Amino acid sequence: MKLFAVFLLFCLVNQIYCRRSRSNTVEVTKKCKSGGKDTSMEKVEVEVSGSFYPTLELPDYCTHRRLDDDKCSKFCEHNCNPPFKRGVCGVWGDSQAGNCYCHT
């Protein structure tokens, strides 16, 4: 009976840990508009903890020239997955150039 109780406790702890681990990652799809077409890139999982928000790195061929804030923000918003709704884009001259920051 004790062995069975230990087994149940182990299963419960394992379930809570696994569920928590899964909820701490968000899948982000890297994309870039090229010649009016969406070119899909690989999907990446980014860990989310505390005030850290996932960054969406733009492919090199999207960052050769500075994107204006409006276009860049729209690009980021389009690529932010729930629960992240809004995107802020780092621009050249900024240490975060070429990254989209997704936030709620």
From Swiss-Prot:
Residues making up the signal peptide according to the UniProt record: 1-18
Q: Where are the transmembrane segments?
A: none
Q: Decide whether keyword Plastid is in the record.
A: no
Where is the motif Putative integrin attachment site annotated in this sequence? 92-94
Where in or outside the cell is it found? Secreted
Function of the molecule: Inhibits proliferation, adhesion and migration of host cells as well as host angiogenesis by blocking host integrin alpha-V/beta-3 (ITGAV:ITGB3).
Descriptive protein name: Salivary protein FS145
Lineage, opening ranks: Eukaryota, Metazoa, Ecdysozoa, Arthropoda, Hexapoda
